Amino acid sequence: MDRVIFHCDLNCFYASVELLSHPELREVPVAVAGDPASRHGIILAKNEPAKQCGVKTAETIWQAKKKCPNLVLLPAHHRLYREYSNKVNAIYDEYTDLAESFGIDESWLDVTNTLHLFGGDAKALANAIRQRVKRELGLTLSVGVSFNKVFAKLGSDYKKPDATTVISRENWRSIVWPLPVGDLLYVGGAAQKLLGQYGVKTIGQLAACKKE
């Protein structure tokens, strides 16, 4: 029997937590930055409107403001983020005792042995978890559902925000093969650039490479 793995990724986590205290800013570009008062430091997180303006995580504040002059900068509150992360993880723990955190805002849940307790429908359970986190904590997440951890993570990245994507035995080739090779876990910018020099730009092209 295939395993049933969820990868849960909280959307724009730092920014989303800050916006719980600033609901009036939800529709404007917002970023959490290292030192917004002095305009030094880097962008730690951004919301969807800021993302649409081209603001990127890890770029400098001045670069972000150049792209998006009306960007609202908020200071980081790391203790608060840990508190919300713990609350979300406590919800996950109610569905499986096989939860594995991946950073402060991502987790894998192996629900293989507990799925039958919640109706047996993996997508329905993923949706229920999303809706519960949103209802109880005011945060959205994307969930990838698959038969292994790598594909589950690709699924959570496939559609954002607040969405569930199922990558199954039946559809995985049509979803996974066309994705950029950089979407793979642990394939960073340097590796992606090197692979590109050999004409490998998609996961499917990488899979077709000879092992030699």
Model-identified regions with their sequence ranges:
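Gly/Gly-Pro- and Ser/Thr-rich, intrinsically disordered tail segments characteristic of DNA damage-repair
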Residues: 1-212
